[in-house]
Amino acid sequence: MTNHRRVRKDCYESRLHDIAKTCAMKEKSKNAARTRREKENTEFCELAKLLPLPAAITSQLDKASVIRLTTSYLKMRQVFPDGLGEAWGSSPAMQRGATIKELGSHLLQTLDGFIFVVAPDGKIMYISETASVHLGLSQVELTGNSIFEYIHNYDQDEMNAILSLHPHINQHPLAQTHTPIGSPNGVQHPSAYDHDRGSHTIEIEKTFFLRMKCVLAKRNAGLTTSGFKVIHCSGYLKARIYPDRGDGQGSLIQNLGLVAVGHSLPSSAITEIKLHQNMFMFRAKLDMKLIFFDARVSQLTGYEPQDLIEKTLYQYIHAADIMAMRCSHQILLYKGQVTTKYYRFLTKGGGWVWVQSYATLVHNSRSSREVFIVSVNYVLSEREVKDLVLNEIQTGVVKREPISPAAQAAQAAQAAQAAQAAQAAQAAQAAQAAQAAHVAQAVQAQVVVVPQQSVVVQPQCAGATGQPVGPGTPVSLALSASPKLDPYFEPELPLQPAVTPVPPTNNSSSSSNNNNGVWHHHHVQQQQQSGSMDHDSLSYTQLYPPLNDLVVSSSSSVGGGTASSAGGGSSASASSSGVYSTEMQYPDTTTGNLYYNNNNHYYYDYDATVDVATSMIRPFSANSNSCSSSSESERQLSTGNASIVNETSPSQTTYSDLSHNFELSYFSDNSSQQHQHQQQQQHLMEQQHLQYQYATW
C-alpha cells in the first residue's frame, strides 16, 4: 500500500516536471518570436526611414508597402546610380542634406505636373507626390505597382511600344555596325560613359499622350471620359550599352526604363480661358476646317478672321511641320485632347510665327457626339523672315490648283452627260410642242362650203335652231371643249375646243338608199332640249366627244379642185361631185367598237397597239366624261386606240340605234314626258332621213 502511494507520487512529480519543462520551452519560444518580430519591426522601421519619403508617410506604412517601395527604390538606383551627382552645380564640400531636398520640392511645385519612372516591365519605380493633385492617387499607392493598372485599355499597346527598345538594336550590335541607336519617334541624346565598367548610356526622347485613371471630384478633375484623364507625357527612354568583350556576342544593351513628366491638359473650361496678348482662339470642324476666329488673330498674324474662315489649318502651317500637326490631329480625334508641338504659322505678307496649340474636342451638351474642335493658341515668337513668302495664300492671291488628268476626264464625262441630257430634254420638248401643234391644227379647222350646198350649224347653247348657209358662205361650227383631250395637254397649254357638227335637213334623202358610205346621225334632238337637269342640255358629242376631234374636208365643184383642211398635217381630196364631207368618229356605247362603212369596206376597230401620234386618234376614257352617271355606260366605253383595218365590214349598226339605246340607258331617270318627247324627236329625225357623208382618208 505504501509502495503504491510512493509510485503514484513519483509519477505525479514527473508529470509536473514535464509540464513545467514544456511551459518553459513555450515561454522561451514566445519570447523568441516576440523578439524576432520586434527585431523585424525594427528593421522595417529602419528600412522605411531610408526611403526618400517624408516621416509622416513612412511611419504609417505596412510591411508589404515598405518592401514594395524599397524594391522600387533599388531599381531606381540602376537608372540613376549616382543620384543627383554633380549635375546640379553643388560642390562636394557643401552640405547636401536639407538643401537638395528643399530644392527638389520647389522644382516639383514649379513643374505643374508629376514625374514618374517606369521599369521595362511596366512597374512604376518612382512617381512624385504631385500626382495626387492631377489624378487623385497617392504616391505610395502608385509606386511599385504596374502602370497598366492605371491607364486606359486602348493605350496599353502604345505603352508597351514606348517601353521597348527598337527591334534593330538587338539585331545590329553597336560594336559591329557603329550605327546610331534611336527610335523613330525619339531623338538620341549624348551618352554618358562609365569609366569603371566601360559602358555608356543613351537616352531616346519620347512624347506621348496617356489616358490615366482619375479619382478626383468632378469639379477638380477637369475633362475626364469614363474616369480617365488625358495626360501629356514627355521624357526619354534610358538604355545602357556594354562593349563587346570578345566572346562573339557583340555589345550588350540593357533597357533601364522610362523617365517622363506628366502634364494635365487644359480642362473642359477651355472656352473660358482669359486670352492674353500672345494668345488667340479658333473653332474648327473635325477635319480642321476653320469656322471661327477671334479678332486678336489679326494683330498676331495679319489675317482678318474672314480671310481664314472656310479654310483648313494645314494651309497656314509650314510644310516641314505638317506631319507633326497631322500626328497631333490624329491624337486629338482619338483621345479627345492634345498639345501640339511647336509649329510655324505662316503670316500674311510672308514669314511665320512659332505657335503651340492646346486643342480639345467639345461635345454637344445634348448628345455624346463630337461637334467641333476648340483650340487655344500661344504665339511664342515675333514674326520671322518677313519677306519670305512660302505660300501664295500669304499674299491674298490664290491661284487655281492644276487639275489632274483623271479630274479632267471626270469633268469631261460630266459635261458630256449634261449635254446629252440637255439634248434629250430639248428633243422631248420639241416632240411635245409638235404634238400639241399637230392637235391644235387638227382642232382649229377651217371649212369652205361647196356651192349649191347648205349646212345647218348647231349652236352650242341648248335650244338654239340651225340656220341654212348659202353658197360661198363660210361655215360657223359650234365649239365645245372635249374633256378627253385633258390627259394629252400640258397644264400650261390651253384646251382647244372640239367641233360639234350638225347635219343639214334633207327630207328627200332616204337612209335605205344611202346606207353605203353614210351614217345616220341622231343627236341633234338632244341639243334642242332644255331639261331641268344639267345633263339634259348636253349633246352626244359633249357626253362622248369624237375620238379624233375633227377631220373636215371640203371640195369645190368648180374645176374639181382640192382644198386642205387643218387636221394635223392631213389633207383631203375633193371629189368631183362637190359633196361636202366631214369625218367624225364616235364610240359605240353598246359593243365598245367603232363601225364605219363605205364602198371600200373600211371599218374602224380598236387597237391598243397603235401609236397615238401615228394614227391621230386619241384614246378615250370614261373617267374624262364629266356627265356620265351610269356605271353601265362607263363599262361600255372603250379606252383603246382606233385604227383603220382593211377587212370585210361587220354587221351594220346605225347611230340612230345607238342613240336610242344610249338615251334609254342614260336618261332612264327622267320623267315619262321627257322620254316621250325624245322618242317623238327621234322618230321625226328618222323620217327626215338626216345624213352625213363621211369620206374615208
Swiss-Prot record:
One of its GO terms (biological process) is axonogenesis. Residues 506-518, 621-631 have a biased composition (Low complexity). It is found in: Nucleus. Pfam families: bHLH_HIF1A, PAS, PAS_3. Residues 100-172, 266-336 form the PAS domain. GO terms for molecular function: DNA-binding transcription factor activity; DNA-binding transcription factor activity, RNA polymerase II-specific; protein heterodimerization activity; RNA polymerase II cis-regulatory region sequence-specific DNA binding; RNA polymerase II transcription regulatory region sequence-specific DNA binding; sequence-specific DNA binding. Residues 636-655 have a biased composition (Polar residues). Residues 496-537, 554-584, 621-655 are annotated as: Disordered. Residues 24-77 form the bHLH domain. Its main location: nucleus. InterPro entries: bHLH_dom, HLH_DNA-bd_sf, Nuc_translocat, PAC, PAS, PAS-like_dom_sf, PAS_fold, PAS_fold_3. One of its GO terms (cellular component) is transcription regulator complex. Residues 406-446 are annotated as: 14 X 3 AA repeats of A-A-Q (approximate). Transmembrane segments: none annotated. Signal peptide: none annotated. Transcription factor that functions as a master developmental regulator controlling midline development of the ventral nerve cord. Required to correctly specify the formation of the central brain complex, which controls walking behavior. Also required for correct patterning of the embryonic genital disk and anal pad anlage. Plays a role in synapse development. This is Protein single-minded. The gene is sim.
